[in-house]
Amino acid sequence: MTVVLFATEYDTPNIVVNMLSETPTEHHLFPLMIKYKPSNRIEFVLQTQRCPDSTRVRPVFICDARRLSLSEYVSTNTPLPARVICAGIDADATRELYEHLFDRKKDETGHDEENGSAARHLFSNLTSTLKCLVHYNRSAILRYLNNTFLSPTFPSWFLSTYGTHEGTLILTMSYYLFERTYSTIQTTRDYTKCFTADPGRNLFTYINMRDFMATMNGSRFRKQTVLFAVFAKARNARDRCELEYVDAKINAFREESRLAADSCVYYVYLAYRTALCREKFLQYCEHTAYDKNLPDDQQCAAEENYLGRSLDAELISIMNTYFSVEGYFGSYIHVDRAKLSPPHSYRGYDWNTEADTMVGYSSTATNLAISLRKLNSTCESLFSPLPPTLMGLLKLCASDRYVPRAEKSRKRTSGGREKEDETRVCRRNYLLNDTSRPIGPMPVFRVEMPEKRHVFCAVSAENWTRRLLPKDLMKNLPSEYVSDECLTDAVWLREDIAALCEVGEQLYRTRHEMFNENLPVFNFVGDVDLKLREDLQGLSRQEVFDLCRALRRTLIGAWRHLFPEVDPDSHPVFFFKSACPQNAAGAADEAMLYGGGGYDEDDDPRPEHAAAMVDYGDAVRRPPFCVCRRKLGLRVIIPFPPRTAAIGAQTLKRLAGILDHTLCLDRDLVCKLNAISHPGECFDTGIYSHGRSIRMPLMYKLDEASGLILHSRLNPIFIVPAGYRDRPAEFVLQQLCPQNLTHHGRPPQRDGSADQLTEVVLHITDRACADSDGNFLQSRARRAMSSGRLPLGPLLRAHLSLESGQSAPSLPTLVGRGGGGEGGASSDYEEERAVGSDEEEDDDDVENLQAFARRIAWPALLRHTRNHYREEVQQQLEAATVFTAVGRTCVAVKRGLYGRARDFSCLARETYTRQETVQVFLDIRGDQRRNVWATLWSRCFTRRCNSNAKQTHLSLKISLPSQY
């Protein structure tokens, strides 16, 4: 059959209905695209609004070629009159197109009655003709045509949709409309560029459809439609193979690695950007362009998997290096260590944990301020004042400031004269009211008390062993190592159920160590949380211990790469597991030890013989060892090598990030983790900030509902290294020693000299992460997104100069956008900043940022907000006078009131109490088109605004004045 795509200059559905009802008007039909095939059937088609199964045209009527001389009109570029079409319509074939719309009613009986049957039959024949059916169902047919088909009446629609060049227009229309393939118009237009270098003349907008029809029917590209269809299908198949290969490469790496959800998004973005960037895709188009010297079956076959191989070379290979142990530590991790020569002031806790009596200080936050003010007054002439806050207490407990004090000893020399000894005192002596000896740095603990109260304690001496460990601990420990499980079972700790109001007692139930950035860190204390899968029905004893052993193997391997002097067979890694919830199902037997207690044999509902059988192997199915549901909480502690400590919170945060990434590099560990938990960062880095606290091992949580019940104790799990297998009791004592369980405690097994520290870790750098707060994928994505941007400083200077009437300074050239360019070799990551990114801010940049926000960005935002915000909000915004830079691209905005800077009330919602606690910011960034984007956002502390979550209100583009 022959298919004719036509158009009209008026309402096409009405013209078609008039022809079907044999009441043609004087309108004409313009055949634009014809697909010939020897047949007596000519289908006149229109483009559909929807294309199920890639069917993009459907017939609206069918003509008989014996009654319609189509070639006569086409050869002379003459439009088809409606009356000629009407005479050539095949009524039977056309009727089938609209059969579903015709309303053909019958009697309820389903057959003709005897009386009047002949008349009924005659009437049925007269009304069942196409003419009559269209007449009686005109509204339904018009509705169908309007809802199903596109019926443009101007040539400009075809030019804007399919292309303005002659070749692009005809080849795209013929392939997209007549070839049922999965392709879009834009993709087909791109195929035409690869098919021919000469797309023909540029077609201007035609005034009438007749000239447009003549141009299309007389084009030389009509002869190339068949050849182009063959090429486009081959190219389409090649594109599909390329994308499937790229998808397979991306998914293969994603499935092998344990990427968190946000990291996975960054990875997918980077992968597709690398493989399908503009430069790579243009090169791919050159390799798959039409070659007239090749046969049709060899078109688009050169260099298979071109995009996938570029992805391998420019991203996957780098990812494989970064996600392998040797490549990661060998190419990306650098540890900056410094030697110390005595005397130096780096000291850990001077903390006696085996004293007969407790020496310390405890206070609430309110009383702490009073005590520190009193201490400042007492030591005013000796020491600089401390801030009367918790930060002041931390500074006091870490201070190395001493003053000499002369006192006479009671012993006399051989000459009978008294001998004067020089002793030293510090502010800690005054705080503890003890001047008998110099008191060194002390730990500061936060203790949770009943009724949601907190007490802060500074402890110099206590008896940890007597208060927390059983008296017969050494008697119950085996002399020979059997297994980690047996050794863990041999240690039974005393259980507590309820909290007490005495601080001295509660200190041994809910103690939290506070991180003190003024002290060196001797032990890496890791807070590990594994988000468990919802379908997990508990973990067996074997699974929990195997997981801990795998964690030790992976972490000690990373420790060995960071500190080569570490012996992996003897260096300890201490594990503590948070006890399971008390109401978890199936908590019994040995799970009671780790389920927080609460088990009573008298309350066991099982028969006596069944309960007795629990201890006999596999006689009955044991309940799970761990019945945690939401997360599995672990405390993992790794001491630094002897005579080595780390300095600074950022060092600990980066170290936690490195260990977190290391967990993704061990295939065996990844399999274990994926089976029980969701991917994501395991180590909490928020605990390594000055003044933040972390619950110590052997301590409980306090129930929020009651404020009295203790639960989720951190119980020990002993994973004995090979070097301690001959003396397991010594390892147990080390794991229960408090000096090994705190950030700043000095392990007692090292030599007892005061200045034992000989080396400190200053920085640990991941060369792939220029931003210390971001990971590898985030840093790479930021560099990819910032490529092509102008530096913000020169851009702001240009805006300010033009705003003040001066000539704008010359702007630096734009950096080209490349796909592989953002990350070719691994050496690219050694640069801290990408070319073209913002430089380090100086005073001029800060002043320019504040001036731009005050003089240009804020007035532009005010003009926009007048029509979109409430009057009281607008009044607040117009009162803003203080603009302070808080980052390279961020400005804090405050109102000026009576000479003071004030925050705002809520900008998004009306609140009952209009508290002025909302922080407002202006984010200012440039783009590659030399525009500046100003974004207004705020943080509101109310729950209705998601408790301090970032709320973006509006973004505004500010162009250079010369572009207005």
Curated annotation (Swiss-Prot):
<dbReference type="GO" id="GO:0006260">
    <property type="term" value="P:DNA replication"/>
</dbReference>
<comment type="similarity">
    <text>Belongs to the herpesviridae DNA primase family.</text>
</comment>
<dbReference type="InterPro" id="IPR033685">
    <property type="entry name" value="HSV_PRIM"/>
</dbReference>
<dbReference type="GO" id="GO:0008270">
    <property type="term" value="F:zinc ion binding"/>
</dbReference>
<keyword id="KW-1048">Host nucleus</keyword>
<feature type="region of interest" description="Disordered">
    <location>
        <begin position="807"/>
        <end position="844"/>
    </location>
</feature>
<comment type="function">
    <text>Essential component of the helicase/primase complex. Unwinds the DNA at the replication forks and generates single-stranded DNA for both leading and lagging strand synthesis. The primase initiates primer synthesis and thereby produces large amount of short RNA primers on the lagging strand that the polymerase elongates using dNTPs.</text>
</comment>
<keyword id="KW-0235">DNA replication</keyword>
<keyword id="KW-0863">Zinc-finger</keyword>
<dbReference type="GO" id="GO:0039686">
    <property type="term" value="P:bidirectional double-stranded viral DNA replication"/>
</dbReference>
<feature type="site" description="Essential for primase activity">
    <location>
        <position position="529"/>
    </location>
</feature>
<keyword id="KW-0808">Transferase</keyword>
<dbReference type="Pfam" id="PF03121">
    <property type="entry name" value="Herpes_UL52"/>
</dbReference>
<keyword id="KW-0862">Zinc</keyword>
<keyword id="KW-0479">Metal-binding</keyword>
<dbReference type="GO" id="GO:0042025">
    <property type="term" value="C:host cell nucleus"/>
</dbReference>
<feature type="site" description="Essential for primase activity">
    <location>
        <position position="527"/>
    </location>
</feature>
<comment type="subunit">
    <text>Associates with the helicase and the primase-associated factor to form the helicase-primase factor.</text>
</comment>
<dbReference type="GO" id="GO:0003899">
    <property type="term" value="F:DNA-directed RNA polymerase activity"/>
</dbReference>
<protein>
    <recommendedName>
        <fullName>DNA primase</fullName>
        <ecNumber>2.7.7.-</ecNumber>
    </recommendedName>
</protein>
